[in-house]
């Protein structure tokens, strides 16, 4: 652990999104599996002692100690995606083990930097009445912004991956009905290949959505009860739903993608946050043309997206740049 020093760092946008994937964890992740106690927040005699307390609690996975370190405000920063949270915590622990340092902003505010890349921790250390504490309330907006940014980037990536998967799926009659068509489901029914993902034995053809699902399995979304359960499980804070129509604001006009039971006219997808304002803000849509559009649907995002059937980006939707 290094002592306090003054340092200025320049970071690219890519760096900042990488930070989001890792450093939000010690706040949002460490609380995901524990009830928040009513105990008052812990204060430390120095920034060095505060950093030492955080590092020891993280390494020991001591959630009770972390509860005291971050105080009651930590409850608002819990991640709704337990699998994502657990994996991010492991990643965070690894970077804490690499290196930690303290960067002095002024006599009463210090920022912790973590890992070999010196990523700034979003919760500042603040001095009050001669004691130091983690000002969770002050860092709350930054924590949520980082989480939302990372989740939204993942949702956009899934939209583009979905387009590639559908383009691959239609090249072969996977369901054996004699018709080349797009998949109407994200996951196949057990024992079938009527969706973009299916389980396959060694030597058999992998599903078009294999890479995405493989990544999900690596991150913990691998138990049968979560992969195949009827109740949807958010992936990095987002739900995904196939759209089977397009509206009047789309090239080609309004029509159904499904003809005589087969989706041959095109395909669409909507990606929307599972917890608007916390896991994401923007809703994303894409169709066979591969252009992703975004829009903030507001607090009623869940209801609006669940009722959405058509890909129809009017002037209120914004094109997402590649």
Regions found by a protein language model. Give the residues of each.
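N-terminal secretory signal peptides that target proteins for export/translocation
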Residues: 1-16
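Bacterial N-terminal signal peptides
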Residues: 19-32
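Short, low-complexity N-terminal intrinsically disordered segments enriched in polar/charged residues
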Residues: 36-60, 103, 139-164, 168
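Short, well-ordered alpha-helical segments enriched in acidic and aromatic residues
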Residues: 62-74, 181
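Surface-exposed, charged secondary-structure patches
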Residues: 71-121, 229, 233-234, 246-248, ...
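Short beta-strand edge/turn micro-motifs at domain boundaries
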Residues: 110-153, 157-160, 291-296
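Flexible, glycine-rich surface segments
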Residues: 169-278
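C-terminal soluble interaction/assembly domains
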Residues: 265-322
């Amino acid at each position: 652990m290094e002592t306090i020093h003054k340092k200025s760092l320049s970071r690219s946008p890519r760096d900042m999104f990488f930070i989001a994937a890792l450093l939000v964890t010690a706040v949002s992740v460490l609380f995901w599996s524990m009830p928040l106690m009513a105990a008052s927040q812990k204060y430390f005699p120095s920034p060095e002692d505060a950093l030492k307390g955080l590092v020891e609690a993280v390494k020991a996975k001591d959630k009770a100690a972390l509860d005291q370190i971050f105080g009651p405000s930590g409850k608002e920063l819990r991640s709704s995606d337990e699998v994502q949270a657990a994996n991010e915590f492991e990643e965070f622990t690894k970077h804490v083990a690499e290196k930690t340092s303290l960067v002095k902003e002024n006599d009463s505010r210090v920022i912790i930097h973590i890992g070999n890349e010196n990523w700034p921790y979003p919760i500042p250390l603040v001095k009050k009445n001669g004691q130091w504490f983690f000002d969770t309330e002050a860092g709350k907006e930054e924590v949520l912004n980082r989480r939302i940014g990372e989740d939204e980037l993942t949702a956009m990536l899934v939209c583009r991956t979905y387009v590639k998967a559908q383009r691959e799926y239609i090249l072969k009659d996977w369901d054996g009905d004699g018709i080349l068509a797009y998949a109407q489901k994200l996951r196949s029914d057990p024992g079938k290949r009527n969706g973009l993902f299916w389980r396959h034995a060694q030597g058999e053809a992998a599903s078009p959505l294999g890479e995405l699902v493989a990544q999900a399995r690596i991150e913990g979304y691998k138990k049968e009860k979560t992969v195949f359960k009827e109740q949807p499980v958010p992936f990095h804070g987002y739900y995904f739903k196939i759209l089977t129509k397009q509206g009047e604001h789309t090239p080609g006009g309004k029509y159904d993608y499904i003809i005589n039971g087969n989706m041959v006219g095109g395909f669409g997808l909507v990606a929307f946050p599972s917890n608007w304002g916390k896991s994401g803000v923007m809703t994303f849509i894409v169709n066979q043309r591969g252009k992703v559009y975004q829009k903030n649907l507001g607090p009623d995002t869940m209801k609006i997206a669940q009722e959405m059937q058509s890909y129809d980006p009017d002037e209120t939707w914004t094109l997402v740049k590649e």
